[in-house]
Amino acid sequence: MALAATGDPETTYLAGKLTGEELRSLGVNFNLAPSVDVNCNPANPIIGVRSYGDTPATVAKYAAGMIRGLQDGGVLCLAKHFPGHGDTSLDSHLTLPCVDKPRDELERMELAPFRAAIADGVPAIMTAHILFPALDDSGVPATMSRRIVTGLLRGEMGFTGLVTSDCMEMQAVQKFFGSVNGVLAAMNAGVDLVLLSHTTLLSGEAAKAA
């Protein structure tokens, strides 16, 4: 949000390029950023200043600079958290949020920055552990939904890059579905890279199950 407050997308590009160069010098080749969530819910406990703003146009404009800058700095990047974490009042690290709005509203607000990021050449997209009943009414979060990952993101939106999950140890998955079951469901949904960020033993169990 601070970068968007400069009013200068070129500053965002330069910040991304410098960040990319510094990460690459340390041996890091993939930065799991930027967030292209639209911070449209004042009660949102987790996105806040991670977002570039409260309108799709603002988010898309400044995310484009960061996406270009990070890649010019020599690292991969991604857009997150698909289809959007901006309009939640719950934190998916702690529980399972739901964005219950019609498809046309999702198109105007949540999906617009992702469509822009795809057009801008973002190489990867991270999925959200959030329910979107208008996109999939089966009761599984986006990360575990074939309708959302393969049907919407790959099919309708034409994304051909890498699809990653958010961490499968977050409570939105672990508490309601189990991390190992979540990993299998995410892979079946079409997720390419499944993240288990904390527990070595759990990572091993998931790898064996897969």
Where in the sequence are the language-model features?
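Acidic/polar active-site rim loop that often engages polyanionic ligands
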Residues: 1, 41-48
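A charged helix-plus-loop insertion that forms the helical arch/lid used to bind
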Residues: 1-7, 51-53
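Alpha-helix N-cap/helix-initiation motif
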Residues: 5-8, 12, 106, 175-176
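Glycine-rich, aromatic-flanked loop segments that form ligand/cofactor-binding clefts
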Residues: 12-39, 59-83
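Generic detector of intrinsically disordered, low-complexity, polar/charged segments
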Residues: 13, 17, 45, 50, ...
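Detector for Asparagine
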Residues: 29-31, 39-44, 181, 188
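Second-shell residues forming the walls of enzyme active-site clefts
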Residues: 54-210
